[in-house]
């Protein structure tokens, strides 16, 4: 639709320009500087020119930068409740839509939060589970209580308890096999292993040793790993399943001496 524009130029450098469509031109000029709120195609603007020749616009109505022909224009756009103020400087465009920016930030935070929670979404589980990625990754400096030792039973001299009844692919399943089945097959989730081991007569303390089982109650199901070695500086090398890479995947890591002091060890 063809636009008709009229302008009144003041000697002080102030201009009022009314723009409307076709037969709405006259009415628009008489109503709110040419802007007719009942006409979806109507818009108007006023502007001042400073001493440097820069234009400063105030717009109302339906408007888009492509509708204004300015050879030298740098527009900073600030959107507030549908009322648009624009400052025209020199060369190029800069857009600052605060509402959109805030929405983007919120969406991003929501995504990260949901992404983190997705690691904690568990389907129906049976006994003897290990930790998910998010829980096991927090198994650092866990405060534990030393469980009492009992009748001297140990992993190194124990007897095979039989079939592995833990859930395949979980940390408990791996550790049971790694110690040759010389522990109970019905100790439940990893979080329960220290207490179950103590009741069964195994030594449980906070001292790491090669061949022991490292255990923590951290997370929804706890976590267990097999101690491969203890280094001269006190750091502990462990192997484990379902730690950060999903069920069935065996990985290894080295834990510092200070971190290791926060875990239980079943001997």
Curated annotation (Swiss-Prot):
Pfam families per record: CHAP
Secretion signal, residue range per the UniProt entry: 1-27
Compartments, record wording: Secreted
GO cellular component: extracellular region
Coiled coil: none
Keyword Metal-binding: no
Annotated keywords: Hydrolase, Repeat, Secreted, Signal, Virulence
Induction remark: More protein is secreted in a secG or double secG/secY2 mutant (at protein level).
Function: Not known; immunogenic protein.
Name the record gives this protein: Staphylococcal secretory antigen ssaA2
Record lineage: Bacteria, Bacillati, Bacillota, Bacilli, Bacillales
């Amino acid at each position: 639709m063809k636009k008709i524009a009229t302008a009144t130029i003041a000697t002080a450098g102030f201009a009022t320009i009314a723009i409307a469509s076709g037969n709405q031109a006259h009415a628009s000029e008489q109503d709110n500087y040419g802007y007719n709120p009942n006409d979806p195609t109507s818009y108007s603007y006023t502007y001042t020119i400073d001493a440097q020749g820069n234009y400063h616009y105030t717009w109302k109505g339906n408007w888009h930068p492509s509708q204004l022909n300015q050879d030298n224009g740098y527009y900073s756009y600030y959107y507030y409740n549908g009322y648009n103020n624009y400052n025209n400087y020199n060369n190029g465009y800069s857009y600052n839509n605060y509402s959109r920016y805030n929405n983007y930030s919120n969406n991003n935070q929501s995504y990260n939060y949901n992404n983190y929670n997705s690691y904690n979404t568990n389907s129906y589980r049976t006994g003897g589970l290990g930790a998910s990625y998010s829980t096991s990754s927090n198994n650092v400096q866990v405060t534990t209580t030393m469980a009492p030792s009992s009748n001297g039973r140990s992993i190194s001299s124990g007897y095979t308890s039989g079939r592995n009844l833990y859930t395949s692919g979980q940390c408990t399943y791996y550790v049971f096999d790694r110690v040759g089945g010389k522990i109970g097959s019905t100790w439940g989730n990893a979080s329960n292993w220290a207490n179950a081991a103590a009741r069964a007569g195994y030594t449980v303390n906070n001292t790491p040793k090669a061949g022991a089982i490292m255990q923590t109650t951290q997370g929804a199901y706890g976590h267990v790993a097999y101690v491969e070695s203890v280094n001269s500086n006190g750091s502990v090398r462990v192997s484990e399943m379902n730690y950060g890479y999903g069920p069935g995947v065996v990985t290894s890591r080295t834990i510092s001496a200070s971190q290791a002091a926060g875990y239980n060890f079943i001997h």
